[in-house]
């Protein structure tokens, strides 16, 4: 029981430190990116470079994910409270969302097509090289 409590506290402390560092970065680098996103990027870098081990944060992260719906209640209440303001500004909110979604879909589509073509080209090139090697072996 004590060990599980220690693991929970350790994971929440690590997640809190990442959030704090993210907020610190957001304060000193005024790029418009929220501190929580910077914190997630730092956590991602820590996990991919294995500076932070997954089992160190697993318990706290699973606890937060389990209660994620409760964490969205204040946001939902805010949307309901300011729904008249959102309706007034719908064209300002809707047009950029639609345009950015379309641009994202186009970029991903073209990139996927390009990468598929490159993979096909690489596969064909390997076949040609293998065929040439076989021809050279047969000629000798």
UniProtKB/Swiss-Prot annotation:
Any matching Pfam family: LrgA
Protein name per the record: UPF0299 membrane protein CGSHiGG_01475
Cellular component per GO, a single term: plasma membrane
InterPro entries on file: LrgA/CidA, Uncharacterised_UPF0299
Primary location: membrane
PANTHER family attached to this UniProt entry: HOLIN-LIKE PROTEIN CIDA-RELATED, UPF0299 MEMBRANE PROTEIN YOHJ
Subcellular location as annotated: Cell inner membrane
Keyword Transmembrane among record annotations: yes
Organism: Haemophilus influenzae (strain PittGG)
Alphabetic keyword roster: Cell inner membrane, Cell membrane, Membrane, Transmembrane, Transmembrane helix
Membrane-protein topology: Multi-pass membrane protein
Keyword Membrane (UniProt): yes
Family to which this protein belongs: Belongs to the UPF0299 family.
Transmembrane regions: 1-21, 33-52, 60-80, 92-112
């Amino acid at each position: 029981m004590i060990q599980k409590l220690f693991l929970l506290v350790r994971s929440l402390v690590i997640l809190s430190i990442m959030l704090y560092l993210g907020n610190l970065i957001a304060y000193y680098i005024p790029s418009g990116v929220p501190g929580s996103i910077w914190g997630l990027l730092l956590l991602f870098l820590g996990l991919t470079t294995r500076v932070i081990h997954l089992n160190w944060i697993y318990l706290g992260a699973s606890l937060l994910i389990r209660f994620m719906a409760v964490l969205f209640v204040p946001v939902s209440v805010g949307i309901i409270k300011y729904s008249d303001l959102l309706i007034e500004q719908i064209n300002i909110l809707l047009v950029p969302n639609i345009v950015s979604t379309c641009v994202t879909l186009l970029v991903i589509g073209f990139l996927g097509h390009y990468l598929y073509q490159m993979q096909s080209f690489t596969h064909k090139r390997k076949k040609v090289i293998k065929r040439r090697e076989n021809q050279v072996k047969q000629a000798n």
